[in-house]
Amino acid sequence: MGKINAVITGVGGYVPDYILNNEELSRMVDTTDEWITTRVGIKERRILTEEGLGTSYLARKAAKQLIQKTGVDPDTIDALIVTTTTPDYKFPSTASIVLGKLGLKNAFAFDFSAACCGFLYTLDVAASMIQSGRYKKIIVIGADKMSSLVDYTDRATCVLFGDGAGAVLVEATEEENVGVQNSYLRTDGQGLPFLHMKAGGSVCPPSHFTVDHRLHYLYQEGRTVFRYAVTDMSNDVMKIMEMNNLKADDVNWVIPHEANLRIIEAVTKRAGIPLDKVVVNIDHYGNTSAATSPLALWDAESQLKKGDNVIFTAFGAGFVHGASFYKWAYDGAAFGK
């Protein structure tokens, strides 16, 4: 038996129908379409507005489309991993809820938490599981209902985020020179003061005080986060290129975390990679946290060709960051959205 490689064999995605555009936001807070577009590059974002629906709904819709597209037998799935910052509940895991709704009879499921870096980290975990030889098919889902954490009276953060989910099927293959090649993943651990949600965890449990003082919303010091994101992501991209002896001309695609268009532009410029090789969809989805990378992959799938050199990179709360080098395993044009 040859070396086992872990390859993505299909991509699914889902975004809610409701579109919250900049014009509507300008009626909610003191902002303008021009200000938002210039600062972060976002024109609109999707919001899950139906009551009683959470992240598991988004994840299930993306996974269901993935299963239908690939034609994979659900009974052959070994594991399902959901990476999210906005789980339905503290427990049980969102992944277990998704698994139950999909009717996966022979799989186990668990959640993974790495904020906006979640998909990058989880793809590496799934690849390692596949390469161990113990598992053959794993569904990885990045999903977030960021609207549940956003304070729509805070113009600094409410313009940034949207809801969505992306899913990939990761399978085992003995084909050479395809799939996840290697990763460079890092955690700073000093980022807590700059990006967090103050209440709701074991340090500061929910109470009348935390609700009254609006402590259950996302808190971010934007300028500091921007600076760290640009520095870390650009260094990570250059490191993964160095590890694999890649020049800028060798890179076909960069799939970045879609947090801010200016961050994406700065990162790729530092790495010497032209913007036309970068998948950018932040203008119409906003920052969907763990969902940004798989949603970008979903949008770009039809353009990807077998053998393409793809670099994933992301940055999130913690701070967590990294990059991975992936050789695409199929012609994406064969699949439609």
Which stretches of residues belong to each language-model region?
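Condensing-enzyme catalytic core mediating Claisen C-C bond formation in acyl metabolism
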Residues: M1-E50, D154-R227, T231, N235, ...
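Short beta-strand segments
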Residues: T9, T83, S113, I138-D144, ...
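Short acidic, glycine/serine/threonine-rich loops at helix termini
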Residues: L20, F91-S93, V150-D154, H321-F325
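Acidic-glycine-rich active-site phosphate/pyrophosphate-binding loop
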Residues: V29-T38, Y89-G103, I139-M146, S202-T210, ...
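Glycine/charged-rich beta-loop-alpha catalytic/anionic-binding loops adjacent to active sites
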Residues: I42-E44, T76-I81, G100-S113, L149-T153, ...
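Claisen-condensing/thiolase-fold acyl-transfer catalytic domains that form or cleave C-C bonds
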Residues: S56, R60-A63, I67, T86-P87, ...
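Short glycine-rich phosphate-binding loop at a beta-alpha junction
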Residues: D75-T83, A248-H257
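Flexible, glycine-rich active-site loops centered on histidine and acidic residues
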Residues: Q131-A165
